[in-house]
Amino acid sequence: MKKIYIYSCLIILSAISAQGTVEINYFYSDVLQVDCGYTIHLPEGYDDSDEHYPTLYFLHGFGANHYLIYGGIHDIIDTLVSVGQVDPFIIVRPDVSTSPYLGSFYTNSALYGDFEDYIIYDLIEHIDNTYRTIDHRLYRGIGGHSMGGYGATKLGIKYYDLFGSISSHSGALVFDNLTDLIPDLMYETSWSPLGLFMPTNGFVSLFMFGASGAFSPNLDLPPWYVDLPVDCNGDVIQSVWDLWMPHDPQRIAQD
């Protein structure tokens, strides 16, 4: 009953709390050579003051983008600010969805493009030059969900001089655990008409192709242009797995 009461109070507070401004904007990325979108939440009163604000970069999950699924975050932020739980801050949600497998894993890839460099060298500079941020690592955080949680952890560790905080929600932090997906991958493949690995076999298959596009792309291997780290018997291909390991957050932290 207590949990229901608290949840009801949050709903009521969300309805009556001061509202920030949510915008979807685009800018040209020199790294990716295309116009890139992002959703930004500016705190209530942003246009009426000269105040500078901390910034949180929130990275979306696999199969999502900057405007789907996570819209409720803005209401939660407004509520927390209204009740004094947090100070006002800016939240930026960049779009790193990409074809053909729906997610870049915030990684530089010959197949997808250099999305790590896009975040680090293009997006942050654009946001700091366009909005009244506090351009200091102690006032810049990075977080995300699922694939975004992985990306936030990896980028936060690699570029600790840029970020003062890292938060990961359901992100893959240790790649050794990814081998637990192999039975599901093989099960999905068993239902394939040809008994072959295909991204259309199921979600785990799509995820494995997506991750392979980030960590082990092979532009000389049509039609999928990736090297999967698993063979037809469900055994790990060590030479491909070794290409994944430099992107393992645990390994990055240890280095």
Report residues per predicted region:
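Non-catalytic cap/lid and distal C-terminal segments of serine-dependent acyl enzymes
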Residues: 19-255
